[in-house]
């Protein structure tokens, strides 16, 4: 069943606009292609305006896990840290749907 890599980022308010532009123009398009994801979506929380969430869709959990532990992902993490270390705190979750109605 479909799986998602969910990346939650808490963004320092002083860099929110730069982060948003970078994610829109560079990171999301590059990640979609490199991750071989089915789709990539992102947005800002309406509960906490400094929380950014990105969703990368995969056909199944195996595909998402393969990406999560790949050299590709390590490279993306390294590049992200070059831009945003100390300004953005993020976490990752893998979720496989167990039910769809």
What is the role of each PLM region?
Residues 1-101:
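Macromolecular interaction modules
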